[in-house]
């Protein structure tokens, strides 16, 4: 046995075999661990690709952000009141603290947004409506906008001004949903959804934004559907409810954790009676609240729009404000803070109360008209002014905060209008409730039972009605149910909200639609049922008939002419100008790429192109080159729609490969028509071989370059090297406006080609549909277009002739 061992140990082949066996065992062990690792990774990727993981992560993240904003904002307001109380007794220092504190915060918020991301200013819901509809708005869903919106909104809310959190936070949640989706796609290796297919993700983000803003999961889903979507996919229902419920739960748990609340309760605690919440005799008062809220809501939207339109007009004041962006928020902040100074004019309309304190005081169960000693009412005591009636105080609060809120939300800071309007509605409802308590001091008697009137109930109903009138949403009633924890007032609240919507929708668009109209965002207005003329309008009446198209027989000179004559982003692609049969649609950047690749400086020297490329490879790769002829930058092709050309370079690598040709050398701009005015030779888009190529360019005269380019421009284009959309959306001339509106809304279209038996006869875009709808709304009556009248008359004559021939045939 020992002999065999010694023989084996002395045998190099045996030793080599044992070494290989050991290495094989190590490799086997490594391969096992690698297989386990790959299995775990695949499982992780599969889990991260699930919808519920995405929803839970998004809900937890948004709840944390919302809680952090509320926590910092509440501490900021406490510090504000602490500073004001420290200098009590010195009126001058009190005024200085009261004005300077919000002034510093508002200016910081405005400046921060201007530097980081100007798209963070305002509400964000109008822009989201257009994005969900299919429009592309750049930089609205980026990380920079998220940072600017979050920081700016937190600082602005700490100022104690009538500014809301709901609209901006919906925008923040949508940004988080987009960024989180991109991150999970990167981790799991999935292809990210196209820009126009992210409506479901953005809708869920909107629902989560409302849910963790107020802790209202049900209302969050419903409100997001009403406000942001014209058509909602039922498949997103469970996503919205799951994410909303989880985010609202985490948001409330965090509040309990920091001991802001004792347990999971409603955001605004109320103690209304639950056995008999209201009497039928109170329904007329609730209806009055709804009708009045409708009028005041429409007036608020009108006033807000007039302020914005005035600031956009060109005059001496607006010129100064546009040059110095911080002057406008500084002036508005100074004026509002001065008027709200508690020892001054502000003492007459409860300006010392912060927004949340105001809502809590308006929702209390006490009847102020019956209160003799207000010192035991807490914050509600600030509504009692010596020698001043409580109704006058509430009326002053409503009037002053009405125009203050309409003015404050126009400042260039992240802000919304939901909470200020909510306060206004609560004051209006409280006013009616106190008036009812004054008219019926002993309560209402019905069937031998006595029902006492609680003005706090009227305040809740007024808050829901006013916000519904401004936003044109009925789900504000559900928001109030979840905010107050009171569901016993379903009937009166729904009556008030529906009446408010009926009145407001007949007078003004919603606040978000008003901003869309002012900013001229690509969005379709709603098609009213009351417009009978819409059924007579067809696509042939509103389409653009003079269409610039590109034919399959076009030359490079024709392409250059089309680009110089129009600024369209897409062109219809037809077979020949004579037949005009629609074959597809081609993007502007694709046409630019065809010209850049064809009329190139390297194509002028085909014999020396390879040598130039080889010499350029060995030369300095980092050297830049500019071979532009002086004075010709204006007519250079490189400057035709330069922003779109730069945007095309930022596309995905796959798309860039599709349009690449066999000669991937630096392109040159297209020259001008005259030999004495040539265009630039090179662009600063490629490096390395430019300096070598310039040597060969110096050997050509301007006349030779001009003749060569003229020959190239007469060559028929080969469209096989570019991407063509072979299935653009098409309509026929007889398509009704109603059906066209539905198709554009459902599919997120921005244009459609109109054909007749395959022949291109026109194009209709959002602008034409919007003009047709708005024309049918203005002044309540719209004359049908001339073509429609001619068509209807012709159809009537044809039908008459058909009837005559049928009768004679019989």
Swiss-Prot record:
Signal sequence range: none
CDD domains named in the record = CBS_pair_voltage-gated_CLC_euk_bac, ClC_1_like
Q: Which residues does the UniProt record annotate as the domain CBS? A: 543-601, 724-781
Region of interest: Disordered: 604-631, 658-688
Give GO MF terms, alphabetically.
voltage-gated chloride channel activity
Intramembrane spans in this record?
125-132, 201-213, 217-225, 456-470, 471-472, 473-484, 485-489
The UniProt annotation puts motif Selectivity filter part_2 at: 164-168
What keywords are annotated for this sequence in UniProt? Answer: CBS domain, Chloride, Chloride channel, Glycoprotein, Ion channel, Ion transport, Membrane, Repeat, Transmembrane, Transmembrane helix, Transport, Voltage-gated channel
Query: Where, by residue number, is the motif Selectivity filter part_1?
Result: 122-126
Give residue spans on the Cytoplasmic membrane side. Answer: 2-48, 507-810
Q: Where is this site: Gate?
A: 166
Instruction: Cite the InterPro entries for this sequence.
Output: CBS_dom, CBS_dom_sf, Cl-channel_core, Cl_channel-0, Cl_channel_volt-gated, ClC
In Pfam terms, one family for this protein is: Voltage_CLC
- Motif stretch (Selectivity filter part_3): 416-420
Q: Which residues participate in chloride binding?
A: 123, 418, 512
Enumerate the subcellular locations listed in this protein's record, separating them with semicolons.
Answer: Membrane
Topology relative to the lipid bilayer, per the entry, is: Multi-pass membrane protein
So where does this one cross the membrane? 49-86, 93-116, 141-160, 166-184, 237-254, 283-311, 320-339, 389-408, 416-439, 490-506
Tell me which family the UniProt entry assigns to this protein: Belongs to the chloride channel (TC 2.A.49) family. ClC-0 subfamily.
Q: How does it assemble?
A: Homodimer. Each subunit has channel activity ('Double barreled channel').
Q: What further fact does the record state?
A: The CLC channel family contains both chloride channels and proton-coupled anion transporters that exchange chloride or another anion for protons. The absence of conserved gating glutamate residues is typical for family members that function as channels.
Described by its record, this protein's role is as follows:
Voltage-gated chloride channel. This channel is thought to ensure the high conductance of the non-innervated membrane of the electrocyte necessary for efficient current generation caused by sodium influx through the acetylcholine receptor at the innervated membrane.
Q: What name does this protein carry?
A: Chloride channel protein
Give the species this sequence originates from. Answer: Tetronarce californica (Pacific electric ray)
């Amino acid at each position: 046995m020992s002999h065999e061992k010694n023989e084996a140990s002395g045998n190099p082949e045996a030793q080599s075999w044992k070494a290989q066996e050991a290495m094989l065992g190590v490799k086997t062990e490594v391969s096992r661990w690698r297989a386990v690792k790959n299995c775990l990774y695949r499982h992780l990727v599969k889990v991260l690709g699930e919808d519920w993981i995405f929803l839970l992560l998004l809900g937890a993240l948004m709840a944390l952000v919302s809680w952090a904003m509320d926590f910092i904002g509440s501490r900021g307001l406490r510090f504000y009141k602490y500073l004001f109380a420290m200098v009590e007794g010195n009126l001058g220092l009190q005024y200085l603290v009261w004005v300077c504190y919000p002034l510093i915060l508002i200016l910081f918020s405005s400046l921060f947004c201007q530097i980081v991301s100007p798209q963070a200013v305002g509400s964000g819901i109008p822009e989201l409506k257009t994005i969900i509809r299919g429009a592309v708005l750049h930089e609205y869903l980026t990380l920079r906008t998220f940072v600017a919106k979050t920081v700016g909104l937190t600082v602005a809310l700490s100022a104690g001004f009538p500014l809301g959190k709901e609209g901006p936070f919906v925008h923040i949640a949508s940004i988080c949903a987009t960024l989180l989706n991109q991150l999970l796609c990167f981790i799991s290796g999935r292809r990210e959804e196209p820009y126009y297919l992210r409506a479901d993700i953005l809708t869920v983000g909107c629902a989560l934004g409302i849910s963790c803003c107020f802790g209202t999961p049900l209302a969050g889903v419903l409100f997001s559907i009403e406000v942001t979507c014209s058509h909602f996919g039922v498949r997103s229902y469970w996503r919205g409810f799951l994410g909303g419920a989880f985010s609202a739960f985490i948001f409330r748990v965090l509040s309990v954790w920091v001991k802001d609340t004792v347990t999971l309760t409603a955001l605004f605690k109320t103690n209304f009676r639950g056995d008999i919440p209201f009497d039928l005799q109170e329904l007329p008062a609730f209806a009055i609240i709804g009708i009045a809220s409708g009028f005041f809501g429409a007036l608020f939207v009108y006033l807000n729009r007039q302020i914005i339109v005035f600031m956009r007009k060109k005059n001496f004041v607006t010129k100064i404000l546009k040059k110095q962006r911080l002057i406008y928020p500084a002036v508005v902040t100074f004026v509002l803070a001065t008027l709200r100074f508690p020892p001054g004019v502000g003492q007459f309309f409860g300006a010392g109360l912060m927004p949340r304190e105001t809502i809590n005081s308006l929702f209390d169960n006490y009847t102020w008209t019956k209160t003799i000693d207000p010192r035991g009412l807490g914050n509600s005591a600030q509504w009692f002014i010596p020698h001043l009636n409580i109704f006058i105080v509430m009326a002053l609060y409503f009037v002053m905060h009405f125009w203050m809120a309409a003015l404050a939300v126009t400042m260039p800071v992240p802000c919304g209008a939901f909470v200020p309007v909510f306060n206004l509605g609560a004051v209006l409802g409280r006013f009616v409730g106190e008036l009812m308590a004054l008219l019926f001091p002993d309560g209402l008697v019905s069937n031998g039972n006595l029902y006492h009137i609680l003005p706090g109930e009227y305040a809740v109903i007024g808050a829901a009605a006013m916000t519904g009138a401004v936003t044109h949403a009925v789900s504000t009633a559900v928001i109030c149910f979840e905010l107050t924890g009171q569901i016993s007032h379903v009937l009166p609240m729904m009556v008030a909200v529906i009446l408010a919507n009926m009145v407001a929708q007949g007078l003004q668009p919603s606040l978000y639609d008003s901003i869309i109209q002012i900013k001229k965002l690509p969005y379709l207005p709603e098609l009213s049922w009351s417009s009978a003329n819409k059924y007579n309008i067809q696509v042939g009446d509103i389409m653009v008939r003079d269409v610039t198209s590109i034919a399959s027989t076009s030359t490079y000179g024709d392409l250059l002419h089309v680009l110089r004559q129009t600024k369209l982003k897409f062109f219809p692609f037809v077979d020949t100008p004579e037949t005009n049969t629609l074959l597809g649609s081609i993007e502007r950047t694709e046409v630019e790429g065809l010209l850049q690749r064809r009329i190139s400086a390297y194509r002028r020297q085909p014999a020396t192109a390879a040598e130039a490329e080889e010499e350029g490879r060995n030369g300095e790769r980092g050297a830049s080159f500019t071979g532009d002829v002086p004075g010709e930058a204006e007519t250079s092709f490189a400057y035709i729609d330069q922003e779109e050309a730069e945007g095309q370079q930022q596309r995905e690598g796959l798309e860039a490969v599709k349009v690449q040709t066999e000669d991937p050398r630096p392109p040159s701009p297209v020259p001008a028509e005259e030999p004495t005015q040539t265009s630039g030779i090179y662009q600063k888009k490629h490096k390395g071989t430019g300096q070598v190529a310039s040597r060969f360019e110096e050997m050509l005269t301007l006349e030779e370059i001009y003749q060569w380019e003229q020959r190239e421009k007469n060559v028929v284009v080969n469209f096989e090297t570019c991407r063509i959309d072979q299935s653009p959306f098409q309509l026929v001339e007889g398509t009704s406006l109603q059906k066209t509106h539905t198709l554009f809304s459902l599919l997120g279209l921005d244009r459609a080609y109109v054909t007749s038996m395959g022949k291109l006869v026109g194009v209709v875009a959002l602008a034409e549909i919007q003009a047709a709808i708005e024309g049918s709304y203005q002044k309540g009556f719209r004359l049908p277009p001339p073509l429609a009248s001619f068509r209807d008359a012709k159809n009537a004559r044809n039908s008459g002739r058909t009837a005559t021939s049928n009768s004679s045939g019989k």
